[in-house]
């Protein structure tokens, strides 16, 4: 490799490996956002935080096989933890899926939680979400406590473990895992 190629290659690799400048880190307060749900109800993150012990923001998709693999687990987790004042909100980003497709998909899979259609991927940009499925767990004060995958092949219940630790006042370990799945389209 020539000296010139090495000069440009090494910094490029470091940039790819470094966290994005705007990426929220675990421990940061997530800025408030509000948008209507698929059912037309207003959703406000700040309001959800005030009335719940925790908020789970899930980036989900109707067409991503990775996201669809976890539909039953997502449904079960949201129902189980609703009893413990944990609210789930789904975010369907991009224009490749319509609000009606997302609404039908939610009904078919028993997703009883609110889902926001975010065609311009503003929420994904705010949280620096890159994949479906991808989870963000916030405590009641809006602080990011866990970010990453829902589970690893259903055998490593990362999100469940994080929610349980948060509710019990224990440290969340790991507080960050690598989300895998389909890329969230950005404009």
Spans of model-derived segments:
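Positively charged n-region of N-terminal signal peptides that target proteins for export
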Residues: 1-6
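Bacterial N-terminal signal peptides
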Residues: 8-19
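Structural micro-motif
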Residues: 31, 54, 111-114, 129-136
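Short active-site neighborhood of thiol/selenol oxidoreductases, capturing the structured segment around
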Residues: 46-68, 163
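Short, thiol/selenol-centered motifs that function as redox-active sites or metal-ligating centers
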Residues: 61-72, 95-96, 135, 182-185
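Structural microenvironment flanking redox-active thiols in thiol-disulfide oxidoreductases
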Residues: 68-109, 116-126
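Thiol-/selenol-based redox modules, centered on thioredoxin-like
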Residues: 139-187
């Amino acid at each position: 490799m020539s000296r010139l190629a090495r000069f440009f290659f090494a910094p490029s690799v470091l940039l790819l490996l470094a966290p994005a400048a705007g990426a929220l880190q675990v421990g940061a307060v997530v800025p408030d956002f509000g948008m209507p749900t698929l059912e037309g109800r207003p959703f406000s993150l700040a309001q959800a935080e005030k009335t719940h012990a925790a908020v789970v923001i899930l980036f989900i998709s109707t067409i991503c096989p990775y996201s669809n693999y976890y539909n039953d687990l997502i449904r079960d987790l949201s129902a189980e933890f609703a009893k413990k004042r944990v609210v789930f909100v789904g975010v369907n980003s991009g224009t490749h899926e319509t609000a009606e497709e997302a609404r039908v998909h939610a009904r078919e899979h028993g997703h009883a939680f609110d889902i926001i259609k975010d065609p311009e991927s503003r929420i994904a940009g705010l949280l620096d979400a890159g994949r479906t499925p991808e989870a963000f767990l916030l405590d009641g004060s809006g602080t990011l406590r866990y970010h990453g995958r829902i589970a690893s092949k259903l055998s490593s219940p990362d999100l469940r473990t994080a929610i349980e630790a948060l509710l019990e006042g224990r440290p969340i370990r790991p507080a960050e895992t690598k989300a895998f799945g389909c890329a969230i389209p950005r404009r």
